[in-house]
């Protein structure tokens, strides 16, 4: 391949230069100027040296100009070292060193700097007078560099000597305390050259901890005492409850042949209604006596047990407030329902026969007698053992039970047999409700809130997860229905029949 001339190389385009570089085996992905230089250097190596010489001279002149400009700008600055401001740690000044040395050193440095600045000014003047000579600035630069390196080396030597002196003084005067009151840095380590952090004796530490701890025997004794205390308190409570139960059983001793009912089993029949008037059996004097006797018989131990509730569950509580308040007397259905557990109920024991409470007797149903006319309705409790015979009468029945038997003996539900149903009598009896008057509604239209047939409420209710989407078939059916309705309406209007 023939090498192109310099004029030809300069006249070529960028793409042609790239092709040429590729053929020569050079890097073609460069800028046009650099590529041209590379090609020239490759084909004509003599021109390369010339260009380098010219570049060197130009760079020298550039550096000289730069230096001269810097000297013009910074004639005032004494030192050429840029100090870091407050970033690193400040060097520890030894206060024993005299200030005179520091002053002499600084003065020496200052004089040197001043001398160098004077030299520079003289050199500047020389360069202005002799601009044509190229060798003079190179020599000046060399001199400057040497002077700078000498200054820096002197400063470094001074600093290093100062540091070594400081260390020696610290090692000798470890005991002497500084005037400021602070221990100098690393003084402690210098005083103890062979000291190392000693590991603690863990065996001794563990033994000390174990000695502090409580022994297992002592712990077991303490635990046993605590358990005994708890169990004794529980036993005391049990004993108290037993004693109270015994005292209650003593209080319930029978006065006569009729045994008082124990509260173990309660009858499921409704309790007796409380009479407003004072009963003849319970006079004020007798009540006082009973209170005294009950307080006298009660033991001190019973009071210790505290509050004892009569009802142990909310499901068995007496919720019939109408009996006490008398404000719901019209609600007679409440009395018919079976009673719940209450303190006012009569209990039944296995020894005594089960008592029965008679229903309230109407005046009309009783046998007509002039004595009974002004007597109120009474619920009567009968016992088979104490039923008075008609011969003896009222004299045989004494006020043994808390409820005194005042009325005459009537038929109980067991003894009275049910008769046949009399239709005429039931029809003649007055109705307990108001019968409906007027026309009845038709059976089909019994629903008050009839849903609209066109509404989608029922569909939405059924398919709330997957709503019903209107399809083409639905629309087709709707159109068919609309046509049918229109046809019916047209026929109706033609025949004179009103169609909805």
Curated annotation (Swiss-Prot):
Residues 48-204, 241-299, 319-353, 365-500 are annotated as: Disordered. The lineage of its organism: Eukaryota, Metazoa, Chordata, Craniata, Vertebrata. Residues 82-92 have a biased composition (Basic residues). The gene is nusap1. Keywords: Cell cycle, Cell division, Cytoplasm, Cytoskeleton, DNA-binding, Meiosis, Microtubule, Mitosis, Nucleus. This is Nucleolar and spindle-associated protein 1. GO terms for cellular component: cytoplasm; microtubule; nucleus; spindle. One of its GO terms (molecular function) is DNA binding. Residues 323-332, 442-451 have a biased composition (Basic and acidic residues). It comes from the Eukaryota. Residues 113-127, 276-298, 380-392, 452-469 have a biased composition (Polar residues). It comes from Xenopus tropicalis (Western clawed frog). It is found in: Cytoplasm; Nucleus; Cytoplasm, Cytoskeleton, Spindle.
């Amino acid at each position: 391949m023939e090498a192109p001339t310099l004029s030809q190389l300069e006249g070529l385009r960028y793409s042609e230069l790239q092709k040429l570089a590729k053929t020569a085996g050079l890097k073609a992905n460069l800028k046009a100027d650099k590529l041209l230089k590379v090609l020239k250097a490759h084909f004509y190596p003599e021109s390369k040296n010339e260009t380098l010489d010219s570049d060197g001279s130009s760079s020298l002149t550039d550096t000289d100009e730069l230096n001269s400009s810097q000297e013009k700008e910074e004639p005032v600055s004494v030192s050429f070292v840029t100090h870091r401001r407050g970033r690193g740690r400040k060097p520890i000044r030894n206060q024993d060193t005299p200030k005179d040395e520091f002053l002499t050193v600084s003065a020496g440095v200052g004089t040197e700097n001043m001398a160098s600045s004077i030299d520079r000014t003289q050199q500047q003047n020389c360069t202005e007078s002799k601009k044509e000579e190229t060798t003079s600035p190179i020599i000046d630069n060399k001199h400057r560099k040497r002077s700078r390196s000498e200054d820096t080396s002197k400063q470094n030597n001074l600093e290093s000597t100062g540091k070594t002196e400081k260390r020696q003084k610290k090692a000798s005067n470890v005991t002497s305390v500084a005037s400021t009151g602070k221990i100098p840095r690393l003084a402690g380590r210098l005083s103890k050259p062979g000291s190392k952090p000693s590991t603690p004796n863990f065996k001794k530490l563990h033994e000390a901890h174990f000695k502090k701890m409580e022994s297992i025997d002592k712990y077991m004794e303490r635990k046993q005492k605590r358990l005994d205390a708890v169990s004794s308190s529980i036993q005391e409570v049990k004993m108290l409850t037993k004693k109270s139960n015994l005292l209650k059983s003593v209080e319930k001793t029978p006065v006569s042949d009729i045994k008082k009912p124990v509260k173990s089993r309660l009858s499921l029949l409704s309790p007796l209604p409380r009479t407003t008037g004072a009963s003849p059996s319970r006079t004020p004097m007798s009540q006082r006596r009973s209170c005294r006797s009950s307080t006298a018989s009660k033991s001190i131990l019973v009071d210790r047990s505290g509050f004892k509730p009569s009802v142990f569950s909310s499901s068995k509580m007496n919720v019939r407030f109408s009996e006490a308040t008398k404000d719901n007397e019209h609600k007679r259905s409440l009395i018919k329902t079976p009673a719940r557990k209450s303190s006012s109920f009569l209990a039944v024991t296995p020894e005594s026969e089960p008592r029965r409470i008679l229903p309230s007797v109407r005046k009309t149903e009783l046998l007509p007698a002039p004595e009974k006319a002004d007597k109120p309705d009474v619920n009567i409790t009968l016992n088979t053992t104490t039923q008075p015979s008609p011969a003896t009468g009222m004299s045989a029945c004494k006020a043994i039970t808390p409820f005194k038997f005042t009325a005459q003996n009537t038929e109980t539900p067991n003894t009275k047999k049910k008769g046949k149903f009399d239709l005429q009598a039931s029809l003649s009896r007055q109705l307990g409700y108001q019968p409906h008057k007027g026309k009845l509604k038709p059976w089909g239209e019994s629903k008050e809130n009839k849903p609209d047939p066109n509404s989608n409420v029922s569909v939405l209710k059924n398919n709330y997860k997957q709503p019903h989407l209107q399809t083409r078939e639905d629309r087709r059916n709707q159109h068919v229905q609309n046509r049918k309705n229109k046809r019916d309406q047209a026929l109706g209007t033609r025949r004179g029949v009103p169609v909805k």
